[in-house]
């Protein structure tokens, strides 16, 4: 009846009254559990020499088993090995310490602590220098890399903030991928005088005298020197073309004085050279191809004149 009442009370507390079948099952389950417990107790009394009371609970059985295994179980439930009695503070917090050491402490060591290390501390190592937009004036952030703190302290405070532009430089160096890409894109349309390749045979013309708009039959844009143009596409194309012409020229101006006959013939064939010769007159021509060593002086004068015209100066001749 007690078991049935207990089952009914449990059902009423949950909001539903157990049925008659459920109450019978609960009674059978409780009788089976008590029968098994009685057999265990009788076996321990008969064969294990355990001093168990007639009506005992499971705590008495656990205490007896601990005593047989060499443990000490006090009246308040404190359990420890013989000869290893812990202090009173540890005894009072023993259940809490066991649960903390087994469940709470290993989880921060395995999950919480290693995760900031690769994400926060690894970022200054992967990038050699901190980003200007993420500059932190707090010296504690540079403890791992002291030289970064020294660099930051050496920068004057009155300087304006660093501005990073995505525009390409006006005249990129020869090692720049922009100049290398512009060299590959050089076509016949980009060359002066309708795509004539004879201009590449005169390195001094390419360096000192870009073609003048007044001395050409076509209307193409001359490969002038880029003058700090802010536009990205024009500056990249002109600077690449200028570097392409400049790379074909030798380092010494006397290289043009050595090649006498071939240079005169090429000047006759190229429109650019012809326009320069017609502008200066026939005073430098000798017997249709016989070139004297001072031919280079004439070429240099033509180059200087065209360079001044390109930059917007007046037409002055030496």
UniProtKB/Swiss-Prot annotation:
Tell me the InterPro entries matching this sequence.
Answer: BES1_N, BZR
Query: Residue ranges under compositional bias (Low complexity)?
Result: 102-133
Biased amino acid composition, Gly residues:
1-13
- UniProt keyword annotation of Ubl conjugation present: no
Query: How is it modified post-translationally?
Result: Phosphorylated. Phosphorylation increases protein degradation.
Tell me which domain of life the UniProt entry assigns to the organism this sequence originates from. Answer: Eukaryota
Q: Where is the composition biased (Polar residues)?
A: 91-101
Q: Which Pfam families match?
A: BES1_N
Q: Where is this region: Required for DNA-binding?
A: 16-97
Q: Where is this region: Disordered?
A: 1-34, 84-133, 166-195, 209-231
Print the keywords alphabetically: DNA-binding, Phosphoprotein, Transcription, Transcription regulation
GO biological process terms, semicolon-separated? brassinosteroid mediated signaling pathway; DNA-templated transcription
Query: Which GO MF term does the entry hold, naming one?
Result: DNA-binding transcription factor activity
PANTHER family this protein is in?
BES1/BZR1 HOMOLOG PROTEIN 3-RELATED, BES1_BZR1 HOMOLOG PROTEIN 2
UniProt record similarity statement: Belongs to the BZR/LAT61 family.
Q: What is this protein called?
A: BES1/BZR1 homolog protein 2
This protein's species is Arabidopsis thaliana (Mouse-ear cress)
Q: Please spell out the taxonomic lineage of the organism that makes this protein.
A: Eukaryota, Viridiplantae, Streptophyta, Embryophyta, Tracheophyta
């Amino acid at each position: 009846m007690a078991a049935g009442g207990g089952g009914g009370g449990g059902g009423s507390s949950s909001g539903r009254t157990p049925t008659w079948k459920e109450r019978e099952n609960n009674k059978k389950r409780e009788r089976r559990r008590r029968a098994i417990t009685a057999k265990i107790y009788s076996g321990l009394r008969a064969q294990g020499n355990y001093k168990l009371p007639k009506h005992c609970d499971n705590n008495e059985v656990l205490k007896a088993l601990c005593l047989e295994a060499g443990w000490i179980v006090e009246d308040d439930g404190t359990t420890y090995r013989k000869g290893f009695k812990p202090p009173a503070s540890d005894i009072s917090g023993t259940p809490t310490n066991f649960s903390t050491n087994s469940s709470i402490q290993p989880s921060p060591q395995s999950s919480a602590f290693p995760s900031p290390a690769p994400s926060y501390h690894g970022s200054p190592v992967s990038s050699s220098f901190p980003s200007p937009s993420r500059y932190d004036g707090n010296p504690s952030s540079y403890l791992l890399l002291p030289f970064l703190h020294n660099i930051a302290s050496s920068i004057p405070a009155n300087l304006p903030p660093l501005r990073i532009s995505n525009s390409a430089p006006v005249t990129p160096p020869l090692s720049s991928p922009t100049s290398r890409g512009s060299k590959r894109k050089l076509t016949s349309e980009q060359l002066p005088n309708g795509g004539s390749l004879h201009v590449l045979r005169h390195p001094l013309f390419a360096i000192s005298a870009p073609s003048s708009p007044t001395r050409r039959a076509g209307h193409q844009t001359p490969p002038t020197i880029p003058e700090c143009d802010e536009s990205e596409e024009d500056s990249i194309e002109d600077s690449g073309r200028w570097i392409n012409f400049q790379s074909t020229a030798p380092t010494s101006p006397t290289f043009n004085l050595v090649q006498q006959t071939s240079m005169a013939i090429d000047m006759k064939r190229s429109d650019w050279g012809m326009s320069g010769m017609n502008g200066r007159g026939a005073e430098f021509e000798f017997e249709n191809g016989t070139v004297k060593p001072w031919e280079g002086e004439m070429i240099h004068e033509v180059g200087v004149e065209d360079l001044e015209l390109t930059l917007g100066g007046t037409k002055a001749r030496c």
